[in-house]
């Protein structure tokens, strides 16, 4: 049995889970998420828990068993508590500001990068004197949050020599030694 898939998902107070025609719908105080699943797995709601089971024991079905259990668990956690990612802008003159859902990034290019953020993601920029600017993203949808954060990081990935670029807070960069004289 899948080590991840066999664990039931506890449903916290204030969260409802519905299963209809291979679609799981999770509703909570922060929002609503839906997920389709294949007929290789079955999803049941019993006694305040979500149980994911698989029909057979092939390699693909074992993988999907753990996958759908993890996706549903992320949905339940997202609508109850939410997820947060913080990006740090490391570099001279790197700045971030926001006007509503528009993120304005100055990352050393000739023009600023203006990015429209999805309405499901809340955006906050923190700029303190003497510290690197931080972009804080919060959402109930973990997949969308990771996609938006990866897109922002992709504008200027951290380089290995000086560490300049956009990185996640707490991310450890593999640094290289410069050329020796």
From Swiss-Prot:
- InterPro entries found in the cross-reference section: Ribosomal_uL6-like (IPR000702), Ribosomal_uL6-like_a/b-dom_sf (IPR036789), Ribosomal_uL6_a/b-dom (IPR020040), Ribosomal_uL6_bac-type (IPR019906), Ribosomal_uL6_CS (IPR002358)
Q: Does the keyword Oxidoreductase apply?
A: no
What are the annotated GO cellular component locations? cytosolic large ribosomal subunit
Query: What are its GO biological-process terms?
Result: cytoplasmic translation
GO molecular function terms listed in the Swiss-Prot or TrEMBL record:
rRNA binding; structural constituent of ribosome
- What protein family does this chain belong to? Belongs to the universal ribosomal protein uL6 family.
UniProt-listed PANTHER family:
60S/50S RIBOSOMAL PROTEIN L6/L9, LARGE RIBOSOMAL SUBUNIT PROTEIN UL6M
Role of this protein = This protein binds to the 23S rRNA, and is important in its secondary structure. It is located near the subunit interface in the base of the L7/L12 stalk, and near the tRNA binding site of the peptidyltransferase center.
Write down what this protein is called: Large ribosomal subunit protein uL6
Species of the source: Flavobacterium psychrophilum (strain ATCC 49511 / DSM 21280 / CIP 103535 / JIP02/86)
